[in-house]
From Swiss-Prot:
Region (Disordered): 348-375, 401-435
Domain of life: Eukaryota
Function: Required for the assembly of dynein arms.
Family: Belongs to the LRRC56 family.
UniProt GO cellular component terms: cilium
InterPro entries (alphabetical): Leu-rich_rpt, Leu-rich_rpt_4, LRR_dom_sf, LRRC56
Record gene name: Lrrc56
Subunit and partners: Interacts with IFT88.
Record organism: Mus musculus
Protein name: Leucine-rich repeat-containing protein 56
Pfam family, one: LRR_4
Residue ranges of LRR repeats: 94-115, 117-138, 139-160, 161-182, 186-206
Gene3D superfamilies: Ribonuclease Inhibitor (3.80.10.10)
Record keywords: Cell projection, Cilium, Cilium biogenesis/degradation, Leucine-rich repeat, Repeat
Transmembrane segments: none
Amino acid sequence: MDPAWDGSQGSRPGTASIRVRELSWQGLNNPHPQNKRLGSHGDIHRERWVEERLSPARLQALAQVDDLQLVRVLEMCVDTRKNSLGNFGLYLPNLIQLKLNHSYLGSLRDLGTSLGHLQVLWLARCGLTDLDGIGSFLELKELYVSYNNISDLSPLCLLEQLEVLDLEGNNVEDLGQMRYLQLCPRLAMLTLEGNLVCLKPDPGPSNKAPQGYNYRAEVKKLIPQLHVLDEVPTTCTSAPAPQTLSQDWLMVKEAIKEGSVLDILLPRLDDPHGATIRKFDPTLPVPETQPWALSLLVPGGPLPEGLLSENPATEDHASNLTHGPGQVLCGNPTKGLRKRRNQYQEWAPLEQMPPHRPDLAIRPSTPRPDPAESCDLAMTGLRAWTEPGLRPLLQRQLEFQQERSAQVQAQDPQKDPVEQEDQTGPKTSLTPPRLVSELSRTSGFHLIPSPPKYPMPPESGISSLGRSADLPFRGRRLRVLGSLGPSLGEGSVLGERLAAVTALRALEASSGPSHRAQGCPDPKPALGPAACPPGLHCLHHLNPIPPAHSLP
């Protein structure tokens, strides 16, 4: 409010009025931030953030000193893509040697600008592509940047105190880059081995050095103050042996750069097991490292055993609705579960066939020798279809047997199917326990006639009998069987006899060739319920179908 305003001047205008409304706030109006307990989520997050920034407390704990001014040598391995070093040089004013080998640095600027007293710097295999920012280390005397991707040496001209420079395994390919090192008056030792400039003076398509090229003599001319070149005194200017850029040499160079062979177990900032930065004691043993397999370094090489799981794509039918974002469930989940259950019940028995599961492709098999000895061409085709490895489900066999009975009865309606069975010869066989249990488990709900879910047997043996009238008899085979009521009896007698005939034919088809096909007739088995295996008693619940008025 305006302090010069008083009541003698009248009421204030409405536009200048101030209204204050008190809210029904039960707590303090201006509460102070609460200090979270140690171990809470926020405190952990704050400590992690402090660790990433290398706070003074963190440096004291890692260097195991109370006074950071006593730290002169520090060795650590960092990844600046995940952790920020900040301006940690402010807390280490007397740091002289810093070793960051095997780290990842996007640029030298990640080290800050407060390391002006640093004299020795190791940056081997740090993924550096340039030396921008090296000018902030004005007192640097030794620089080791081997096995990086450095090709430009111009930033080094600012280092007047530089004495030792290691450029082994970099990408220096132009001899003119050596002119920048002329501005380093104290440079005495230089390592250039592993650079293209050692093979040819300038970049070009050829991998061979020009005739008479001697890089040692050329470097000595450009850097006269140099004393040692590639660990050999510069007074020895004899031409080295001719060298060529071989594929093996390039592969070894790149492998060293990537750190796949000579990786040492240095602690990292993101190490969850404790100290992430520490000062190494030279007397402590360094743990040996297990080198990677050579196949991991060579492109296209085989992977070592155990690296991949034996069955990475195992299908789990109990959770195929939750396979991640690759499969989206739309609509009613209840209907989806029912559909999945029906599909699994339909295909699971076929997948559980142990010997021949990989070979699920349907192939026509060869009939057994001498098929002419069989009196029934349809049974010959059925035996060829039920070869081991291609045998379909028991339900498929039951449907085929019922269809065959309907075809024969359609040709001679006055003939009893049991008498036809007597003429063709009785067939008995022992049923494996697995088939009996499978029949007893599935016969309660698989006896509804439906189109077959699998291809029919090959047409070589039954084309003249079954294929001409396949579709008409498929839809009304049970009705034709129901029309046989007067000849077979009424009520439960018909159901028992039909069940016995169907069971015997199914057992014959599932166990291979019959005795009659091999020329050995067997005595006629009993057709009563006692003769059937225990797993087949549920077949007696079949009720006869009322006879049709007329045959189609």
